[in-house]
Design a protein with these regions (language model features):
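Active-site phosphate-binding/coordination module
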Residues: 44-137
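Short, small/polar residue-rich loop motifs at catalytic or cofactor-binding pockets
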Residues: 23-26, 49
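Asp-based phosphoryl-transfer active-site loop
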Residues: 25-41
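Conserved acidic, metal-coordinating active-site core of Asp-based
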Residues: 128-198
Length: 198
């Protein structure tokens, strides 16, 4: 859920990045994580790790762009001895841009806060639709684990959201599309992943 001001910032940041990279002739690769860089079942990147590290050693910048939280992406960096810039929560925040160029900030927020999103949701979504929605953050850890497919020790990182509310929609496709329209008219967007919506 990026605000209009967020869209302007997002465009400005990427225009600046590409201008700077063009001047320095650097290569940047933007990649998703789950199901792309990471195995969709094990969340490991063993199969591509050697090639991945070879690219980094050649000075190629790799920027994960993920629905994952800042906490999850920091953990990914730490667990794999990496220091990557990254885009968290479906473009809601950009981290470590100063690693790409010293004139860029460390962190840019281009979305509403979780509380702002919750307030818009409460004010604009009917009870009928609310009854079709499971809020992942409100579930017990075991149920969160079943839905997200993550080990228990990773759940606490996955639910540490700053700019999105993970949900599971329990209605028909027609109802889901209507729900999307209501959110859009309320100034919010929703992303559908392999397991949940944000």
């Amino acid at each position: 859920p990026i605000s209009p001001r967020g869209h302007e910032l997002f465009s400005w940041v990427f225009m600046l990045i590409f201008t700077l990279m063009k001047q320095k002739k650097q290569i940047i690769i933007f990649t998703d994580l789950d199901g792309s860089l990471l195995d969709k079942d094990t969340f490991e990147f063993n199969e591509i790790e050697d090639y991945f590290r070879e690219l980094i050693s050649k000075g190629i910048k790799i920027i994960p762009n993920s629905s994952k939280t800042e906490a999850e992406l920091l953990d990914f960096n730490e667990q794999n001895n990496l220091d990557l810039s990254f885009i968290a929560e479906n473009g809601s925040s950009i981290h470590g841009l100063n690693k790409i160029h010293q004139n860029l900030p460390d962190k840019i927020i281009i979305s509403r806060t979780k509380d702002e999103i919750q307030n818009i949701y409460e004010s604009n979504i009917s009870l009928d639709f609310k009854n079709k929605i499971t809020h992942i953050l409100e579930l017990e850890r075991e149920k969160q684990q079943k839905i997200l497919g993550l080990p228990l020790d990773k759940i606490k990182l996955a639910i540490k959201r700053d700019h999105s509310l993970p949900i599971k929609f329990n209605g028909t496709e027609i109802e889901k599309n209507e729900f999307r329209k209501i959110l859009k008219n309320s100034g919010l967007t929703i992303q559908t992943g392999g397991r949940i919506m944000n």
